Amino acid sequence: MAVSAARRVAYEVLLRVFEQDAYADRVFRTAARDLDERERAFAQRLSYGAVQRVRTLDYAIDTLGKRPVRKLDPPVRAALRLGAYQLGYTDTAPHAAANESVELVRRARLERAVPFTNAVMRRLTEGIRPLLDSLPDGPLKESYPDWIAETFERDLGHDDALALMRAMNEPLETVVRVVRGDPPLGAEPTDLPGAYRVERVDELAVAEGRIWPQSRGSQLAGLVVGSQDGERVLDLCSAPGGKTSQLRGDVTAVELDPNRANELRENLAKLGATNVTVVEADGTKLPPDLQGFDRALVDAPCSGLGVLGQRPDLRWRATPLPELQLALLRSAAERVRPGGTIVYSVCTINAEENEAVVEASGLEVLPLGEEWPQYAHPRLSQFLLTLPHVHGTSGFFIGRLQV
């Protein structure tokens, strides 16, 4: 029997992500390039949903299949995960999910595993929904590593942690920044200047540099910098360039990775950001001539716990980076003139990478909560913290500091 193009793509994504440590978005872009819009949307839902929910799916397969997932052949493991996701979380016809999972195993030339796959899919068809309903609220039911759930609970409390995990398992708003020209047809204004909600991103408008896909959390970080014409601005860790292109003044954008630096240059040219000079350098070891800046943006690498909804595999590979973040912040402080300001932003919800890094820097905090009260940090109002379950956008911590 045939296997739909969307399921073939989702199966490939599951195989590559969990067996070859590939990145879901990169595999998906390549695998889905020939799909039409409808197939692509279905393939993305299956791919990203199954990757996100894999902890819960594996529990269901272990429980109902009566054989540990880790001991299965990789193609069988991927096919069962795909089938289980459809049965547990979509309205796909059960026979289609089961039959095509079996066919994927057959096509992998694992005929000996076909009866087992068929039997497990039958058990999942009958039992996965009751099993999912019986799970207690928490990281197993919502499919997060325990350490992430514990981090959220420590920083936000039990109820908000649970609401946050649920929110990042569902699609968030799609927002674009209007770079030039009119907003897209049907776009809805938001509370940020130039930021509009859209049903879908107009790829032609992106290619022409008229709009840029960028969450409100990300745009807020760029706005808080507040740079003006005539000022010298340092932007560390700049790629892919969304926030960089928001900055006014004479901007020096630093990026370590040569490939990402090239991507940054291409994006800035597309967006018409002629005020930016790209420098390939380590943000913790800047060239000596980069001195005397009026402002800096340190949009530091982080665990990404605020963008787990947009990056489905990140929850399984996330790593906190407080030492690197502090090194970057201190590096920026050495290059900004006395009295100048630094905006520290990270797309994570983790006190160890957020306020603890700011405190360790020893820099003076300039309060932000009164300027942006709707985004004020719930415990520390001098900072901003966008939260997916509260604001409907990606999670960002933002602090403004004075040298």
Predicted regions mapped to residue ranges:
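S-adenosylmethionine
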Residues: 1-403
